[in-house]
Amino acid sequence: MTPLPERAAALPGIDDAVLHAVATGSYHDPHSVLGQHQVAAAGIADPVTVIRTLRPLAEAVFAVLPTGAYLELAHLAHGIWQGVDIAGPGAYEIEARYADGSAWSADDPYRFLPTIGELDLHLIREGRHERLWTALGARLRDLGGVTGTAFTVWAPHARAVRVVGDFNGWDGTLHSLRNMGSSGVWELFVPGVGEGAIYKFDLLAQSGDWVRKIDPMAQLAETPPDTASRIAVSRHEWQDGEWMRRRAASDPHTGPMSIYELHFGSWRPDLGYREAADQLIDYLGALGYTHVEFLPLAEHPFGGSWGYQVTGYYAPTSRFGSPDDLKYLIDRLHRAGIGVLLDWVPGHFPKDDWALARFDGQPLYEHADPRRGEHADWGTYVFDYGNSQVRNFLVANALYWLEEFHIDGLRVDAVASMLYLDYSRDADGWEPNIHGGRENLEAIAFLQEVTATAYKRNPGTIVIAEESTSYPGVTAPTSSGGLGFGLKWNMGWMHDSLQYIREDPLYRSWHHSRITFSFVYAWSESFLLPISHDEVVHGKGSLLGKMPGDHWQQLANMRAYLAFMWAHPGKQLLFMGQEFGQPSEWSEERGLDWWILDQPAHRGLWNLVCELNAVYRGAPALWAHDNDPSGFEWLDGSDAAGNVLAFLRKDGRGEPIAVILNFSGAPHTEYRVGLPFAGGWEELLNTDADVFGGSGVGNFGGVTAVEEPWMGSPASAVLTLPPLGALFLKTGR
């Protein structure tokens, strides 16, 4: 090997242990050794420019200067080469020659300044970087005409970090990141690495062991079962400006919201994001839904988790296409007038050893105490909500989906598991908070931060809680101590109403309170009524399968039940397949039973859902005052013997909708119902109509109310109530 030139012999020495650590990729600050440096040399007045590079197997190494001149470097130690550039600091490339006659040349990653700025580092230290995805991860950069990728990762416990990938043979020795101080961030710009490259990080734990991990901030990943992160570039140009302007000026609470919940992989199997656009828009448009809610689309390794065990929080699953393909789908939905909601899972994450778990060799994203850091039921870890950087990771992730993908709302999964320290734990399996209580104060503060930040930055969006307890103030504003959610799933309504509708009509009178109790607390929170995927799996059967009686009676019960759901105060959500009465339980492994739409009875149910949505969207009484008791009035909630409910939904403008439900198996003739006005009332909807598969019992399109008071109402009308049916009446005034 070439000896050091005489001038280099006057350079200050570097400790051999440091050189060895650099050579093995285990040094925290490789840029302090490698790259280009101005150093003082003994006997020389001015600083000299020293170039050092790591090429452990080379026979000869040169720095190729902008002039085209070759500066030969000498071997220093452990594969590190060094030379003095008499021309002074400037750009250069490294060329290495090997014993087999091959040569390699590239820009030196260690000659570049940090690609992450002081403001970014300050915000990360403080846990306040609301656009974290623009600072961390893998970002394509052009630095002085040199294109490449800036890799940045937060790993505060690591002793060293290397990036490995298909661009370096999965050997990160030549690509060690520098530590950026107290921020816990590591950074390296690698020239020549571009879009589509796959990579992971190798992290040296305090224990001395190396762990290989995906990038927590990656915006794309390999398709499972492969797990590497992939460099992505977005080129999508949004065309939904009008939708976004309307959204920012609207209040989702006072508008219609009818949600179709969808598991992407089993709605129509083999469709990708882009390919699904036309079919999904046509289908949702025909049904009349205002919104679609996707089960989680963030990357997850196990399809059987339905997306609820996330490993790539910033990466849409690549099973169905690229991030731009998903943006295209959302863009198309918006232009078709359909809002998009997304399930979001900040409550727990899986223990896969290549993902977030023990990320830098010890608990980082998860709480270190298993009493707070593990979900035994699910076999997952729980985020450490008291760690400001972990909280920042999650808050920024919510914003990422809202802002980068134009998502209109997030449904937060398993909120109850976050709120309570003793959730699904034995008496000795949890630790009280600082006040001796069971509430998880850090998680509560996190949820408040998520909702407040989401609404501040993205007006018109909504954050929805799947929360199954009686925790107070879930939808109360954070300014008054609430969690700030826009809506809460009404699990009480769901459980009670399903228990009621399962009963044979002969025995429902004994369970009348189950169908009326939800009206007692309907305005204690802002509610959404869910018949979700959770109710049609794990042996629960389909919604149709919950209905008693023969096939006709099952469908009639279901028509009446859905009408009750649409008429009840609160927004509504129905899982895919239930709109046409799928008989079989849902499975993520196969598609829906689309063939059953060829059967007239099931097509009739589908027609009813179309009509329910059309009536709903056109009648502000059914949605304008969902969260205000002034939008509801009982006409008769006490007829347990007849299995009848009658109530008004009101819009505040004198155009109410009267809803009369007969959950008995027989028609009621000459049935008097109180109404607020005398005069004609149009039969706006009859679930027993022939077109819906019913028996055709009804009131010939309308009734006339007379000024005969009844049960507190100033007028009344005599009706025929169809069996297992619902009527919506609209005043003809």
From Swiss-Prot:
It comes from the Bacteria. The active site is at residues 413, 466. Signal peptide: none annotated. This is 1,4-alpha-glucan branching enzyme GlgB. Monomer. Catalyzes the formation of the alpha-1,6-glucosidic linkages in glycogen by scission of a 1,4-alpha-linked oligosaccharide from growing alpha-1,4-glucan chains and the subsequent attachment of the oligosaccharide to the alpha-1,6 position. SUPFAM superfamilies: (Trans)glycosidases, E set domains, Glycosyl hydrolase domain. It catalyses: Transfers a segment of a (1->4)-alpha-D-glucan chain to a primary hydroxy group in a similar glucan chain. Pfam families: Alpha-amylase, Alpha-amylase_C, CBM_48, GlgB_N. Transmembrane segments: none annotated. Pathway: Glycan biosynthesis; glycogen biosynthesis. Its EC number is 2.4.1.18. GO terms for biological process: glycogen biosynthetic process. InterPro entries: A-amylase/branching_C, Branching_enzy, GlgB, GlgB_N, GlgB_N_E_set_prok, Glyco_hydro_13_cat_dom, Glyco_hydro_13_N, Glyco_hydro_b. One of its GO terms (cellular component) is cytosol. Keywords: Carbohydrate metabolism, Glycogen biosynthesis, Glycogen metabolism, Glycosyltransferase, Transferase.
